[in-house]
Amino acid sequence: MSSKSTKRAKIEDPKDNVFMVEKVLDKRTGKAGRDEFLIQWQGFPESDSSWEPRENLQCVEMLDEFEREFSKREKPIRKRHSQKPEPSEDQADPEEDKDEKKETNQNDKFSLEGKQLKCIVGLTKGPGELHFLCKFSDDTARLLPAKEVNSRYPSQVIRYYESKLTIQDPKADEL
């Protein structure tokens, strides 16, 4: 991003505390259909980043710039429409084609193709399942189901759990 990304912006909470926005990390559509932004707070670790609706933020220029950059990298690829060739007797069963398409759609469900996982920032329990907060090499962060992260990035998951593991000496308990 340009030099504007280093600007500081404010958010005010009801207690009149002012928090400075260091960086906008990601964007999503919230439950109410409103745009929410993943905010990196100045003076706080990235693990304290939070999703905030636009109306809670006073950093209009920073949000507009992020949206311009976000729209550049999120443009859909247009496909040319051509006539489909007549099916031949050699072609595979249409049911098999549907299964393959379904499998491909599952792989693209989280839009992770080509993304390199930089690190796992945290772990949380959502409704019914665990989710990892993952940071990618392009400095975006996403909350993903643990099943998806376990299958795509198993070594990173092990590394994350190892970093959180504490081992106690059983002999120390006897003293």
From Swiss-Prot:
GO terms for cellular component: chromosome; nuclear periphery; nucleus. The keyword Cell division does not apply. It comes from the Eukaryota. It holds the Pfam family Chromo_shadow. Residues 71-109 are annotated as: Disordered. Residues 99-109 have a biased composition (Basic and acidic residues). Keywords: Chromatin regulator, Chromosome, Nucleus, Transcription, Transcription regulation. Residues 19-78, 115-172 form the Chromo domain. GO terms for molecular function: chromatin binding; histone H3K9me2/3 reader activity. Disruption phenotype: Causes ectopic up-regulation of transcription of specific genes, such as lin-39 and lag-2. Causes accumulation of double-stranded RNA transcripts. Splicing defects. Results in increased levels of spliced xbp-1 under basal conditions. Increases survival in response to ER stress inducers tunicamycin or dithiothreitol (DTT), as compared to wild-type. Knockout in a chromobox protein homolog hpl-1 mutant background has no effect on the distribution of monomethylated histone H3 'Lys-9' (H3K9me3) in chromatin. One of its GO terms (biological process) is heterochromatin formation. InterPro entries: Chromo-like_dom_sf (IPR016197), Chromo/chromo_shadow_dom (IPR000953), Chromo_dom_subgr (IPR017984), Chromo_domain (IPR023780), Chromo_shadow_dom (IPR008251), Heterochromatin_chromo-domain (IPR051219). Gene3D superfamilies: 2.40.50.40. It is found in: Nucleus; Chromosome. Residues 88-98 have a biased composition (Acidic residues). Seems to be involved in transcriptional silencing in heterochromatin-like complexes. Probably does not act as global transcriptional repressor, instead targeting a subset of genes. Involved in RNA processing mediated by Tar DNA-binding protein homolog tdp-1. Plays a role in linking epigenetic regulation with the innate immune response. Involved in the endoplasmic reticulum (ER) stress response via modulation of the unfolded protein response (UPR), acting mainly through the IRE1-XBP1 pathway and perhaps, to a lesser extent, through the autophagy pathway. Interacts with histone H3 when di-, or tri-methylated at 'Lys-27' (H3K27me2/me3), or tri-methylated at 'Lys-9' (H3K9me3). Interacts with Tar DNA-binding protein homolog tdp-1; interaction may maintain localization of hpl-2 to gene bodies. Interacts with histone H1 his-24, probably via interaction with hpl-1. Interacts with chromobox protein homolog hpl-1. This is Chromobox protein homolog hpl-2. The lineage of its organism: Eukaryota, Metazoa, Ecdysozoa, Nematoda, Chromadorea. The gene is hpl-2.
